[in-house]
Amino acid sequence: MDTTQRLLQLTSPALPVGAYSYSEGLEWLVDQGTIDNESHLRTWLLQELAYGSIRMEAAVMVRGYRASTDVQILQYWNAWLSAARETEELRLQSLQMGRSLLRLSKALQDPEHTGPELIEVWEQLQTGCNFAIAFGLTANLWQIPLESATLGYLHSWATNLISAGIKLIPLGQTTGQQLLFQLQPHIEAATQSILLLEDKDLCSCGWGLALASMAHETQYSRLFRS
C-alpha cells in the first residue's frame, strides 16, 4: 500500500488531537505587538526552525520512530522530552495531543496485527505520552518512511502556527498560504539536519518561546488554550 495517504492522514489539520487549539505563545506575542505582520511571523517561524524547541521535538520523534516497540527506549525519550519542556503550558499541550494520538492509533490498529510488544507500549505510555513520541510510534506502525514522517511533523507544526497567525494578527488566507509555500525549502533543510542529529546534539535555544508561553498562561483574554 502507498503510505502517502497515511502520511496525509497523520499530518492532516483534521486529525483529532486538538492542535488547532494551541498557539505556542504566539497569541501573547501578537497581543504585545511583537508579531503584527507576515514578515514578523515568517521571521519567528524561521528562527524556531533553526534554533527552537521544534527541532528538539522532531529529533525526539525520530528516536521514537526508531525505537518502534522498545518500551524502555520510548519511556526514556518520553521522560527526556517532558523534562525539556520549558513551561507547564507546553508540557500539557504535548501530553494532551500525545494522549489523543495514542488513543486514535489504537482505534485504527488492526487487532490481527497487534502483537504483545505493541500492547505493552500502549499500556506503559497511556498515563502520559508526549505528542512527538506518539507521532513517531504511529508513523512507524503505519510504515511511513522516516524522512517523510519528519518532514510531515515539521510541516504540520508550521501549518498550525500559520493558521493561528491568520486568526490573531490577522492575515489573509492567501497570505498564509504564500508564507507556508515560502517556508517549504526551510522545512526540507531542517528535516535533513534533524535526521543527522546525534543524541549529544539535542538542544534548543527557545527562551523567547518559553517567555511567551509563560506569559500566555496568565494572559487575560485568549482565543487559544493554555
UniProtKB/Swiss-Prot annotation:
Q: Which cysteines are joined by disulfide bonds?
A: none
What GO terms fall under cellular component here?
A: cytoplasm
Do you know which InterPro entries this protein is assigned to? UreF (IPR002639), UreF_sf (IPR038277)
MF terms from GO for this chain are: nickel cation binding
Question: Which terms are listed as keywords in the entry?
Answer: Chaperone, Cytoplasm, Nickel insertion
Task: Note whether Membrane occurs among the keywords.
Answer: no
Where found, per UniProt?
Cytoplasm
Per the record, the major location class is: cytoplasm
Entries under HAMAP family matching the protein: UreF
Q: Which family does it belong to?
A: Belongs to the UreF family.
The record describes the protein's role as: Required for maturation of urease via the functional incorporation of the urease nickel metallocenter.
What is annotated about its quaternary structure and interactions?
Answer: UreD, UreF and UreG form a complex that acts as a GTP-hydrolysis-dependent molecular chaperone, activating the urease apoprotein by helping to assemble the nickel containing metallocenter of UreC. The UreE protein probably delivers the nickel.
Q: Know the name of this protein? A: Urease accessory protein UreF
Gene from which the chain derives:
ureF
